[in-house]
Amino acid sequence: MFSIFIKIILILPSIATKTNNIDIKSWRSAQTFDGFGAVSGGGATSKLLFTYFSEKSDRKQVLESLFNKDNGLQLLKVEMGGDDQSTEGTESSHESEKGKISKNNYEFQLISEVREINPTIPICVLPWAFPGWIGNTPYDNVTETAEYVVNWLKIGRDTWNFDTFCVGVWNERNFSESYVKELRKILNLNGFNETLIVAGEGFRMDDSYSRLLDKRFINEYDIIGVHYPGGRIPENVQKSGKVIWASEDYSTDNRDTGEGCMARTMNWNFINGNITGMISWHLMSAFYPQLPWYRCGLARIDENKFQTEKAFHVLKYITSHVKRGWKILRESSGRFDGGGTYVTYTNGKDSTIFVETMSYKKSLCEYSSPRPYHVKPSQLIRFKFSEIPSFQGLNMSLNFGPSKFFSKSVNSTITILLPVNSFGILTTLPVSTPKRVTIKTPLVPLNYHDDFENYEFDEEPKFWMPQKGSWVVRNGRAVQKVTRPSISWCTSHIRTPYAVMAYRKKNSILNAEVNIPKHSTAKSIILGIRSNCSGCDIEVINCRGIFVEIEFSNKKVTIFSDFVDRSIIAEFKARRKVEFGKFYKFSIHLLDSHLFIKFGNHHVMTSVEIPEEQLNKTNNDTLFVIGTGNFGISEWDNISTDYFH
């Protein structure tokens, strides 16, 4: 039996010495460490990885830096796409229409490539939205919803050769006991007996906790998932015997307090909440900087480079020196008297202690900040170890500094000085100091053009970030495939499928060939420039832009701004016939105060004067928009952009 004795003595400047004795002689208080991971999704957050690093060999470098077995992430959680907005954009569903299975969602490709780097990494999945054919809610027909979810797991197993470690219920929305029971049944019937169910998955779970602990339900699921808990887990939940995860956490701007938030949260979750696993949102900001929550992940990608963020480097202090399955020692973890925390991990042979003394202001998180507290300017910490015969000393690294070796004294003590706003490790292992990884992006062409010929069936178009509905490539065309509103996670009142792409030059032209098939329920197409429409808040802010809508049934053309509550600028009839079932080429661009609209290959353009107020409002907005006026199939080809001086 492994035994460890740790004594921690704090000597604070100018005050009497205080001693905090911790005596561990067995693993009776140890808990299994489930790992630190990240979420891909919750809004197509990894989408542009496949645009900027289109070659698999280039992506391998990126994913190696995030998931290598030596110091990478230990869990990967992905969104189960539902064709609807889920923060940064939509993720394509694997079954947008009942019985029509799509197997090339980019998350499947991401999982496959991550598993080539780390074949044993656990994969978890959670829906944000659901396709509309399921009903008004996921719980209208629990069997149908469970079968829909299990179909995703089947694709993973049968097509992409991975097993799903855990599956959630519905992101940050109410759960249903009857659905969870049915999901367990359907999982087992399809050979997924080992797949765990994560229940909860919400903010502010006061009522949810009592339901989760109901003796008639508590054995129907495996993990209690909590989002942004800040370590605040009720005592009865901590003592319930259920595994508790922060199944979504972090999401804090790395340009501000992200690094400190991560350092504090990693420890506080366990010390305050008995939380043994943490999954950070989001894996990478692989979306346009114009979209919300940019640089609130563990890495970022733009047209110039991939780069890891400091929050990930903090996390790597643990992932480099602690593995899933190690034990967290409850009685060897706690708070320093002068502020700050320490958590001890061990595998019975080696040990790692993560320490942090982050101040309140330097560790604020977007969602889970505590009440104000105070940390002493510096603290002298004396660790005392005994009953570990092979133990000679500890390697220490603080704040990404070089490693230092501290030999234990005759009485098995090691003394360190911890200033405020410090974080790092003491470990029996050689120290791997986290460092930033930067990988240059392959050259991105100045002008965009795509004929959609070199795609797998149902692969998602590059560069475009759908914000409502979903585009996939089929037979050389980008198809908006959603025919009815989804069970929405946000933007539930929006009935306009649309996608956005950032443009690189101010004076830009958008060209597209578009067909609305005869059988489609879509009635019009929309092109837009100088827009800021993205994310979940478009209804609140009434997102802006300069948009052109062409109705196929009556040739009516409407120019408008303000996407939700439209401000009409002009209306007129197109000069040429526009029919369903035929492709037409459309172009729009803005020159000074004039919007030019071009139909087909004709040289004649229609010019509309844009009011100065609308020009001023959209002057700094840089998103192109494509879409349809309502749900229904539309086909897009030869989309391109040009710019002029």
UniProtKB/Swiss-Prot annotation:
InterPro entries: Aldolase_TIM, GH59_C, GH59_cat, Glyco_hydro_59, Glyco_hydro_59_dom, Glycoside_hydrolase_SF
Active site: E172, E248
Known EC number: 3.2.1.46
Glycan attachment sites: N141, N174, N193, N274, N395, N411, N532, N616, N620, N638
Cleavable signal peptide: 1-16
Membership in a protein family: Belongs to the glycosyl hydrolase 59 family.
Role: Hydrolyzes the galactose ester bonds of galactosylceramide, galactosylsphingoid base, lactosylceramide, and monogalactosyldiglyceride. C.elegans contain specific sphingoid bases, which are unique or different in structure compared to the sphingoid bases found in other animals. Two examples of these distinctive compounds are: 15-methylhexadecasphinganine and 15-methylhexadecasphing-4-enine.
Protein name: Putative galactocerebrosidase
